[in-house]
């Protein structure tokens, strides 16, 4: 019993220490601390190499919050960090620097031998991670390619950097760099999703319209028989589309009640993530069946109960 209490006490002390570590808070790094200030905090007992509960460390948070270059490079060089240290989702510092469009820090890491052809837990390389983050600065990609990255790399779904970047672009001209490098606007991923499907995930009308002018098929169906409506229904990682996006796609001739090869309508996808009641109601009005079942016997209500809010349920 005493041994158990001792172990619990040690764990609690460690947890309290982690909670008190100023380096593991975004607020500290938003103040843009200097090297001298970081050294002072270290001398006060804060660890510049420890992780928080999500495997973010001081260097990662410094990069994500735009800390000064000198501060970030100081942290990188501390014993216990280094260019190959794995952080959240098995990402090295090069991933975070590319994601934040921090070319100077990328250059520093690459000079220190940072690897460019590695993948994190979601099978993204630093180059693909920058694209997923919507980074259109060509200097990021030029630097990575110069150090051996492959622009033709794809994620686990077979999507290349161009497809991953398209949802975030404001002007299709921003894609010219990738097209000149050999990537094609006509590309599809392993699931058969085309460029317009990807643009639809963020409801990116300017890009959808520009792609249609390039003869990209707005009515393309993927391997599961799904149109861009399903892409819009799935949305982006942290965002969902509003009703105006679906009204726009409907005006382009896409059916809101189109079923995929499993017999499921877009409502089945919407119920899991989209929190806009107007969207849900509109799809119901368009004939989407609230009682449809997937192969596991789940219906839209069950899907919404797992991850959506009470108003949608």
How would you describe each model-predicted region?
Residues 16-45:
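Sec-dependent signal peptide cleavage junction
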Residues 31-33, 61-68, 96-102, 129-137, ...:
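Ankyrin repeat A-helix N-terminal signature
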Residues 221-313:
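Eukaryotic tandem repeat interaction scaffolds
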Residues 1-23:
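Bacterial Sec-dependent N-terminal signal peptides
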Residues 134-254:
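Solenoidal tandem-repeat scaffolds enriched in leucines and small polar residues
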Residues 40-47, 73-81, 107-115, 142-150, ...:
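Ankyrin repeat domain, specifically the short helix-to-loop turn at the C-terminus of the second helix
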Residues 20-29, 50-63, 85-95, 119-131, ...:
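Ankyrin-repeat boundary/"N-cap" motif
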Residues 57-107:
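Mid-chain, structured segments of secreted extracytoplasmic proteins
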């Amino acid at each position: 019993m005493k041994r158990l209490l001792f172990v619990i006490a040690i764990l609690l002390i460690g947890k309290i220490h982690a909670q008190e570590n100023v380096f593991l808070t975004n607020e500290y790094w938003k103040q843009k601390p200097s090297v001298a200030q970081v050294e002072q905090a270290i001398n006060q007992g804060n660890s510049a190499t420890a992780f928080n509960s999500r495997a973010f460390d001081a260097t990662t948070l410094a990069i994500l919050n735009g800390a000064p270059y000198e501060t970030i490079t100081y942290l990188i060089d501390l014993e216990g960090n280094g260019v190959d240290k794995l952080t959240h989702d098995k990402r090295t510092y090069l991933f975070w620097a590319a994601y934040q469009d921090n070319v100077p820090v990328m250059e520093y890491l690459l000079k220190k031998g940072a690897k460019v052809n590695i993948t994190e837990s979601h099978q993204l390389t630093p180059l693909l991670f920058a694209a997923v983050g919507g980074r259109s600065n060509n200097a990021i990609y030029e630097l990575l390619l110069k150090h051996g990255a492959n622009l033709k790399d794809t994620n686990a779904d077979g999507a290349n950097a161009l497809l991953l970047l398209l949802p975030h672009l404001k002007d299709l001209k921003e894609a010219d760099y990738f097209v000149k490098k050999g990537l094609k606007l006509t590309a599809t991923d392993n699931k058969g999703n085309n460029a317009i499907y990807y643009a639809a995930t963020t409801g990116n009308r300017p890009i959808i319209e520009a792609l249609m002018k390039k003869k990209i098929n707005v009515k393309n169906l993927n391997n599961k028989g799904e149109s861009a409506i399903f892409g819009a229904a799935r949305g982006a990682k942290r965002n969902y589309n509003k009703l105006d996006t679906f009204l726009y796609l409907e005006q382009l001739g896409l059916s809101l009640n189109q079923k995929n090869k499993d017999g499921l309508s877009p409502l089945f996808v919407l119920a899991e993530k989209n929190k806009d009641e107007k969207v849900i109601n509109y799809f119901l009005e368009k004939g989407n069946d609230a009682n449809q079942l997937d192969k596991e016997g789940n219906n839209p209500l069950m899907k919404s109960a797992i991850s959506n809010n009470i108003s949608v349920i």
